[in-house]
Amino acid sequence: MKMAAVGSAKSTGPGQRSKSRPGALSAPLSLEEARCPVCSEILLEPVTMPCGHSVCLHCFQRTVKLISLCCPLCRLRVSSWARKQSREKSLVNAELWELVRLSHPERCKRRMEQRDGEIPDGEIFRAPVPVHKVGEMRQEYEKQKMKSGRSEETDERKKKMHIKEECVLLKHCQYPFCGVSDSENEEPVGRRTRHVSAFVRKTRCSPAFNKSCLHSSAAQRSRSCTDSEDGRGKSRGHTNQAVPEKANIAHSYNAGILLSSENSRSFSAPLLSLDKRHHWRGIHTSSATLVLQTKPERSISPESNDSISEELNHFKPIVCSPCTPPKRLPDGRLLEPMIVKSTPRNLTRALHKSTSYEASPTILQKWKQIEVDRQCIKVTSKGTVTSPIAEDLNLKLSPVEERDCQPCSCSVAKDRLLDLQCICGSNAHKSKSRKDKPIIYNKRRLIFDPYNKGEEKTQVAALIKTFGDSSTPKACKELCEPSEMGPPMLDSNAGHCNQGTVDPDHNIKINEPTTMSCVLNRPTSRRGKKRSQKTKHMEETLQTKISRTNRYDSLDDLIVQRMSQEKEDRELALKLQRQFDRECKKVDRHKTSRNKYELRSWGSKDGIVGYNTRRSGRVSKQNEHFNYTC
């Protein structure tokens, strides 16, 4: 195409020159001027278009007349000119054609005889053939492979370095004060606190923090150079023990709210160091000790976490995102959120609330077992209990039960049983109405009384009694007599196996023992685990409960086996029933069955039998049959 463009640029000269001087022959044309820009050969019967470009007649017909009617070089449209010249038969530029024949007669003759292949060898360009040496291609391949391998290794090394830098940066962001040494204290503060959160910066800028830093900077700097890690742990422990005793509110209601609010803010609050968070929680959760589990550090700087923790140890509200407001019920009352704590020692408060609603016997039994297990864990745990157990073990009665139950004037002679109440009749009218309608009042109460006789030990007893009709003080005294109480028992609805008692007025048996209630007697949280006791005197306290649990193990296994067998039988019966229903729904299409396909009626609606050549014999027979039956 380049050669065609060059040829065309030079071929415009003769055409334009012939137009300018029509009668005179100019000087001979050079080979480049007489070359066709399309086929790169000598011009044969050239056609000069209005734009001045000249091509061979054969090339003009192939590229212009039959295709686009445009100049192949400048894209000028020559359709009207071509039609006009074709009608006049004057497409060939005669003057230019004569000039080309005079300038290059041999080439024109050879072109007209179609002997274009006899071009001299000097004009043909031959590209040099590259000959490779032995192993040159392999060397180039290995060199390229090594280059790509080096680039991959470099990329992997860069990725590893980037990941390592990100890990170091993340660790520094999480624990900004854990690795600061004395040599780093001389660095600018901005470089060390670059990744500290805005909350810590705000705390540092507070006036109280500045005062504490001024007072404690010299002492902490000297201590960081001289004290050992153990000494620092002890001093930190003494500092933490200096917190006011008002902070010791782990078992109160406000402490639970503080814990729940802190847990809900754990994702929105700024990320402080690990030992600070443990110290803040240790004040609330551990009522026995305030010793911290400190993390070993290389040194403590004046701007370290101790100075910040001195500000945070006081009970001030944490400035962070507000908590979610409590939900409101449709009647307008606020729904108190459920508080979940980490240690079983603090989970006893939920059962101390008065319950005035009706609960199922299974739920009451589970509540009792959970309360007993938690009290055992609380007594036998390693931590010391700040509050007496008697205060924690006394369960309050509901307001409904306090109205119904009136304390009698009977005296308990031998045992020191606290909060023992009985139900006495208020008047004779109520007793008569009760005799008319034999109604059994079954009051379920959970009473945990400390039993101290001769030695310091606490007996956890769940006393739930069922009272019938007792209108006289004598009957009330008999019920309140401690010699007749025996071991603590629950009624049949609460889940224990006990002896049945008979109502003398109505001759109705109350508290019938059930086998199903014995299964629920076992503790839920400590079932199948070895109990670790702190002291030996507690073993005698829980011996009765352990023996009762072992007594019903065999019965428990039997009932579980029976229930599993019933479940398997029920599943088998359902499977057989489904199979039977499937067989009943299946339609039998055999010849002898009643569900077989019905035959088509041979008669039409009008009583005229249709004619069919294929079934003419059968149609006639069927018609005769119908006529005979009718």
From Swiss-Prot:
Disordered: region residues: 1-24, 220-247
Gene Ontology biological-process entries: DNA damage response; double-strand break repair; negative regulation of double-strand break repair; protein ubiquitination
Zn-finger region bounds: RING-type: 36-75
Keywords assigned: DNA damage, Metal-binding, Nucleus, Transferase, Ubl conjugation pathway, Zinc, Zinc-finger
Motif LR motif mapped to chain: 599-611
SMART domains recorded: RING (SM00184)
The protein's annotated pathway: Protein modification; protein ubiquitination
Molecular function terms from GO: K63-linked polyubiquitin modification-dependent protein binding; nucleosome binding; ubiquitin-protein transferase activity; zinc ion binding
EC number: 2.3.2.27
Cellular localization per UniProt: Nucleus, Nucleoplasm
Gene Ontology CC terms: nucleoplasm; nucleus; site of double-strand break
Motif window: MIU motif: 565-582
SUPFAM superfamilies named in the record: RING/U-box (SSF57850)
Catalyzed reactions per annotation: S-ubiquitinyl-[E2 ubiquitin-conjugating enzyme]-L-cysteine + [acceptor protein]-L-lysine = [E2 ubiquitin-conjugating enzyme]-L-cysteine + N(6)-ubiquitinyl-[acceptor protein]-L-lysine
Domain notes: The MIU motif (motif interacting with ubiquitin) mediates the interaction with both 'Lys-48'- and 'Lys-63'-linked ubiquitin chains. The UMI motif also mediates interaction with ubiquitin. The specificity for different types of ubiquitin is mediated by juxtaposition of ubiquitin-binding motifs (MIU and UMI motifs) with LR motifs (LRMs).
Family: Belongs to the RNF169 family.
Protein name, entry field: E3 ubiquitin-protein ligase RNF169
Species for this entry: Danio rerio (Zebrafish)
